């Protein structure tokens, strides 16, 4: 209880949690039905795959730039403010630019949309999360607790997204703008005293440099150990978008008598799943302390293999809804251990760049590679074959990861991680042992 009270009294926790909450509200209200919206615009699976591939390519380029710039900015919010401004404008952009262009020239719309949507959301997510994680390390927070508010925000908007989509899909995008305005206000005006002091210290010309150099940041690409993890992420986390965003919504809606019912039930299910995901953000750090960072990552890929594979086996709404709930533990098992893996085995000052390259950019490369071919496979072979193919790829990646992902006590170049089972006995335990020994004597 005391720990909980202390967290709620931490102004940086309140600020960063509110910011990431509003970001995921702004994104989730339309992103959860983006694939359904593209279908409503007359695009088939292959064309939807092309849209996702182009988005991923733009996201890939932007994310690497974001990582380099933010690691150099440290705690400054300049890039976060740019993302907030784009989020605030997503409604007008889709209403007056993206949708009209999509009806006349799909490729032009895909190119323009990839820049705006990636800059504000897909690549933006990969900036907001490292910034929140950096605040957590600097101001004595638990990153998982702040990140849970992002999932909570996504869950809230997912609860209503399906119903709003059935009324008019454009409302989803305009609600995204409303949340974006709130996000912009938070990051523009809310500076807790400890953050102002930290920024003042960083601006002192006599202070020792704490931010990595460009050479340091580009040097991450020369790390063989990073490329080992990139391959693992490329063959696992990639499918969060390829499967869950590009294929699953339409598949799930098809299990119901009509499209409107499917959309409404999917929105509700998605909300329940993300609510549980939010809760699991607080549970996964406990799991990590029990099983370790490496094993938590492998557990995440195992859950993904089972979830996608079972979607290719079951074909009724109840079973698929139960399988969908596996997602609630899967996302935290990828997100939180990935961050901790980077700060464990690499220089923590490079956390934003490492997260961009090793986690997010790897996933985006996978989406560029897999989105269109799997979209074509889905059009030709249907749900079952496509889902089982993806599941087999994830299984192969899990086996690969078992042999190549480093143990928690191997090549520790960052902040050490000690599992609960390996921690030294506490002082109280030591005193009890000494007392027992004295009585025996």
Predicted stretch roles:
Residues 163-180, 376-394:
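A membrane-interface helix-boundary motif in multi-pass transporters
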Residues 85-103, 303-315, 402:
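C-terminal ends and interior cores of transmembrane alpha-helices
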Residues 113-150:
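Cytoplasmic helix-loop-helix junction between adjacent transmembrane helices
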Residues 9, 65, 93-99, 180-195, ...:
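Multi-pass alpha-helical transporter architecture, strongest
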Residues 3-59, 225-233, 237-257, 335:
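Helix-loop boundary and gating motifs at the non-cytosolic
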Residues 38-39, 69-71, 148, 163-166, ...:
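Interfacial helix-cap and linker-helix signal at transmembrane-aqueous boundaries
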Residues 1-10, 191-230, 254-257, 419-431:
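Juxtamembrane intracellular "pre-TM" segments in multi-pass secondary transporters
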Residues 61-75, 165, 279-293, 378-379:
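Helix-to-loop junctions at the C-terminal end of transmembrane segments
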């Amino acid at each position: 209880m005391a720990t909980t009270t202390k967290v709620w009294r931490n102004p940086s926790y309140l600020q960063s949690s509110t910011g990431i909450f509003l970001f995921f509200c702004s994104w989730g209200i339309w992103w959860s039905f983006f694939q359904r919206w593209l279908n409503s615009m007359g695009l088939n699976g292959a064309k939807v795959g092309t849209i996702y591939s182009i988005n991923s390519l733009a996201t890939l380029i932007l994310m690497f730039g974001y990582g380099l710039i933010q690691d150099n900015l440290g705690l400054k919010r300049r890039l976060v403010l740019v993302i907030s401004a784009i989020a605030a404008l997503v409604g007008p952009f889709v209403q007056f630019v993206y949708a009209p262009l999509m009806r006349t020239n799909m490729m032009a719309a895909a190119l323009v949309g990839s820049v705006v949507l990636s800059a504000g959301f897909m690549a933006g997510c990969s900036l907001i999360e490292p910034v929140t994680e950096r605040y957590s390390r600097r101001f004595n927070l638990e990153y998982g607790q702040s990140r849970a508010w992002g999932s909570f925000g996504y869950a809230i908007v997912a609860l209503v997204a399906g119903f709003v989509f059935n009324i008019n899909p454009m409302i989803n995008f305009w609600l995204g703008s409303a949340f974006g305005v709130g996000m912009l206000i938070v990051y523009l005006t809310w500076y807790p005293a400890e953050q102002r002091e930290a920024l003042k210290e960083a601006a002192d010309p006599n202070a020792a440099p704490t931010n990595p150099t460009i050479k340091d940041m580009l040097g991450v690409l020369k790390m063989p150990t990073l490329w080992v993890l990139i391959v693992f992420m490329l063959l696992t986390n990639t499918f969060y978008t390829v499967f869950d965003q590009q294929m699953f919504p339409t598949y799930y809606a098809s299990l119901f008598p009509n499209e409107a019912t499917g959309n409404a039930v999917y929105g509700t299910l998605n909300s329940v799943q993300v609510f549980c995901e939010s809760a699991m953000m607080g549970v996964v750090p406990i799991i990590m302390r029990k099983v370790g960072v490496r094993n938590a990552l492998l557990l995440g890929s195992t859950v993904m293999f089972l979830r996608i594979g079972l979607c290719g086996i079951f074909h009724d709404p109840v079973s698929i809804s139960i399988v969908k709930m596996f997602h609630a533990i899967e996302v935290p098992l990828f997100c939180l251990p990935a961050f901790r893996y980077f700060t464990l085995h690499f220089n923590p000052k490079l956390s934003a760049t490492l997260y961009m390259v090793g986690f997010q950019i790897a996933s985006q490369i996978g989406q560029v590679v897999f989105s269109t071919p799997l979209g074509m496979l889905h059009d030709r072979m249907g749900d079952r074959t496509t889902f089982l193919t993806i599941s087999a790829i994830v299984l192969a990646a899990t086996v690969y990861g078992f042999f190549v992902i480093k143990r928690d006590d191997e090549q520790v170049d960052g902040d050490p991680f000690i599992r609960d089972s390996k921690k030294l006995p506490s002082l109280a335990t030591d005193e009890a042992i000494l007392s027992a020994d004295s009585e025996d004597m």
